[in-house]
């Protein structure tokens, strides 16, 4: 640990790294406080900050030669087969590690790799290359099984822990597996942190963007007070401020042959309202809607919009245009609504629900990976990050209020490289609830812009369902619908 005065040059470097965000660190008294330039306190500067050779320091960091925490179960014939770009990442990592060892820098690297790149399998290859006992830390139980499958395939001795850390510590008294896969809340236990700091050399923080290390979290404290010998941050959407804890970044652009299309399903709706809707509308401008909870609740009961989503999905699925569908909502009740309606139409052999409250969901996810046709309905919380169904070819986004990081993670669910190249996303920018009409349009436009500008999707207007609408629609309504489409197209 390095306790340093917050001199101007150090403060300026930290501020630049975090893109001007507020910086919070542990001071010499152990308090987690906002850093001010010229403060009389000394601050605990994270070990990973010095992993970049751009940071000047006279500090010397210990190397792997000082430990003997080696994996005993490596079989070179079990090493995973990598694609050329994945091999390039491994080559970059090994090259950077050599330089870090030569310069006596901490062996900390952020792997900033696109959604669908194959970060898990690439990291498993690196684990076998290093041959060091490893901790894999995930933000939630749902990612445990994804890692377990890959570690098993590599043939490494391992253990997963999703229950209490106290029972795990008892087991570790008699056994010390080569790879330990845990949820991040285990790091709230100091005894566990001390144990892995002593007996494990490599620490892998999966989905590192889900942790805000400018907050006083268990992961923040672990990295500050029990820094591992080697560390990887894995993410497709890194937080700038987290660089303070892992300051060497490898980012290799992913060239793809995928044909990615985002369809904008426009439709004119007559205003729709109920007593329930009117009551929720009253809360839109209040503190209870700070995170747009009521905005999403209104979307969940917007019957005309929900019917449009169902009609579009049914039409596309029946035509065979799409075959392995992910339907995403923000709220659980919205998910259950779509699941029940689709279950009535297609049956339990085709329609599945990704419910975080059901312990059997991970096993169900495994079972549908080999199916040729299925519809998987889930929430942004469960499936937005880390869902491992590589064969997905289409995504229906039923919610609207999603931040940029979540959008990129969500779209990544349908951007995994497979033999089939077509990928399709459907968004619905209109609502029949007039009080949120423009708000929903703006939120959905953000999804469209990010998908096109950053992720390489081609934007197209979806016309099939609208063209099949009955001709009996009043002339005034048809004219308003046309004007609505023109307005929407001008706003894109």
Curated annotation (Swiss-Prot):
Residue ranges annotated as motif DEAH box: 206-209
Family to which the UniProt record says this protein belongs: Belongs to the helicase family. Poxviruses subfamily.
Chief place where the protein resides: virion
SMART domains given in the database record: DEXDc
Residue spans crossing the bilayer: none
Name of the gene encoding the protein in the UniProt record: OPG145
Function: DNA helicase which seems to act as a postreplicative transcription termination factor. Involved in ATP-dependent release of nascent RNA. Forms a stable complex with single-stranded DNA, and to a lesser extent RNA.
UniProt GO MF annotations: ATP binding; DNA binding; helicase activity; hydrolase activity
Subcellular location: Virion
Parts forming coiled coils: none
Keywords of the record: ATP-binding, DNA-binding, Helicase, Hydrolase, Late protein, Nucleotide-binding, Phosphoprotein, Transcription, Transcription regulation, Transcription termination, Virion
Full protein name: Transcript termination protein OPG145
Organism encoding this protein: Monkeypox virus
EC number: 3.6.4.-
